[in-house]
A protein has these predicted regions:
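Structural/interface elements that position substrates and couple domains in central-metabolism enzymes
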Residues: 1-445
Length: 445
């Protein structure tokens, strides 16, 4: 249930490893698009996966979930729990799905939490299902199977995970989920995203926990990743004051096997729908339970300051922003996605336009979503059009194609050869050799 990013990746991948999957969503227009073979979001390999599994009948879509719910062996809830303005969790969509299940089914069912949910959600679901279901019609088991899918690599993350986490309170649920995930756990399936068989991969570790522990593991994991990113950004600020190079520092620190290099990249901060929300939810959980939330709160504070720091760096470089033409390369919160939710690039776009700058933008995938949110956005067909006669060019998303642009050409078409690299994508030595004034994050100018 739910045809967003998590639901489509989970449904498409489960269908690809041999299961019959029905994806249900109350958004009839979204279902219509999916039935026509049109994906409403960008995720590498997902479109071909959906088309292939839809064509062979292993994956279908419906806006009327009742029949699918009755015939299902397991019901995966791929429905997020957003936050209200006051920081409280909004369970409306999840509760609505639970009520729909309770009214539709007439036999015992396994309900699986797939999207990230607050701790104790499983118990709330059980209670809601019990009080909503007509007496003696059905018995429900609730399990947690948190997803660890990164936007941009989600399909590969599903097929080749480091671990599969199952939160369980009964043996029957464990048996069902072991059977569902057997091809993944054994790495015994034809990989649909490679022309030939997949290269050998290490078998994923199966982790069994209680439902409550599994819910906590997911929140704690995301909060820790946020702390690592913010720690790298604190190091970047320190390097700028001391004349050090944050990439040299984080590379050396990350070689320690106790730390590892992932998520130690300095820049303009993290965004997206999940990490900021999960960090706030984790802080709120700690406070509610009387536990010191200083560390995750500090990570949130550091992250919220990143775009202001980069905005000030841009302002110092240009002196006056009003009427200056500024080109933005990248609008999505990270590469390989069209997701602009909580994107640092979007925050900078709003700050720059509010200051009177004339902003042009290019993103390989996120322009449509950006236009929907900001109809006045001046978008360009490529990076060169965006850079033409620009007083400054800001790199805000780490798209690989930005690394290999014809930078001498861009040098020739800009009004002023000023580049501010918010993702440390380019070599300072190379850019300066071309005659650019080049500033990045935590590296010597």
């Amino acid at each position: 249930m739910g045809c967003g990013h998590v639901g489509l990746v989970t449904g498409g991948c489960l269908a690809a490893i041999g299961h019959h999957v029905i994806c249900a969503d109350r958004d009839a227009e979204r279902i219509r698009l999916l039935q026509e073979g049109r994906l409403p979001l960008y995720e590498p390999h997902l479109n071909e996966l959906i088309l292939r599994t839809s064509a062979d009948g292993s994956l279908t879509f419906t806006a009327d979930a009742a029949g699918a719910l009755r015939s299902a062996d397991a019901i995966f809830l791929c429905i997020g729990v957003p936050q209200l303005e006051n920081g409280e969790s909004d369970f409306a969509a999840l509760d609505s799905a639970a009520i729909q299940i309770a009214h539709a089914v007439d036999s015992p069912k396994l309900i699986v939490e797939r999207s990230t949910v607050p701790v104790k959600t499983g118990e709330q679901l059980k209670h809601l299902l019990r009080v909503t279901t007509p007496s003696s019609r059905a018995d429900f088991r609730v399990a947690a199977n948190p997803q660890f899918l990164r936007e941009g690599t989600a399909v590969d993350d599903f097929f080749h995970p480091e671990r599969v986490l199952l939160g369980l309170d009964d043996a029957e649920s464990e048996a069902t989920l072991r059977q569902i995930y057997a091809p993944i756990l054994q790495q015994d399936f034809h990989c649909p995203i490679h022309a030939e068989s997949c290269p050998p991969r290490k078998l994923p570790e199966l982790l069994l926990a209680s439902v409550r522990s599994a819910e906590l593991i997911k929140q704690a994991s995301n909060a820790f990743l946020a702390v690592k990113i913010s720690y790298a950004n604190v190091l970047a600020d320190l390097c700028e004051r001391l004349g050090g190079d944050v990439q040299e520092v984080t590379h050396a620190v990350g070689l320690d096997p106790r730390i590892r290099p992932s998520f130690l990249q300095a820049g303009i901060g993290f965004g997206g729908e999940r990490l900021p929300k999960d960090l706030r939810a984790f802080c709120k959980l700690l406070e509610a339970e009387g536990v010191d939330a200083a560390i995750p709160k500090a990570a949130e504070h550091v992250n919220l300051a990143r775009t202001e720091i980069f905005f000030q760096k841009t302002e110092r470089s240009l002196w006056v922003l009003k009427h200056k033409k500024i080109a933005l390369l990248g609008l999505s919160h990270k590469a390989a996605t069209d997701d602009i939710r909580s994107s640092p690039a979007i925050d900078l776009y709003k700050r720059l336009t509010a200051a009177g700058a004339l902003v042009t933008a290019f993103d390989p995938q996120a322009i449509s979503n950006a236009h929907a949110a900001f109809p006045g956005l001046v978008s360009c067909r490529d990076a060169y059009e965006a850079a033409e006669r620009a007083d400054a060019l800001l790199i805000l998303t780490e798209w690989d194609e930005f690394r290999v642009l014809d930078w001498p050409r861009i040098r020739g078409i800009m009004a002023r050869p000023l580049v501010l690299d918010g993702r440390n994508l380019l070599s300072p030595h190379y850019m300066k050799s071309l005659g650019f004034e080049y500033h990045s994050v935590g590296r010597p100018d």
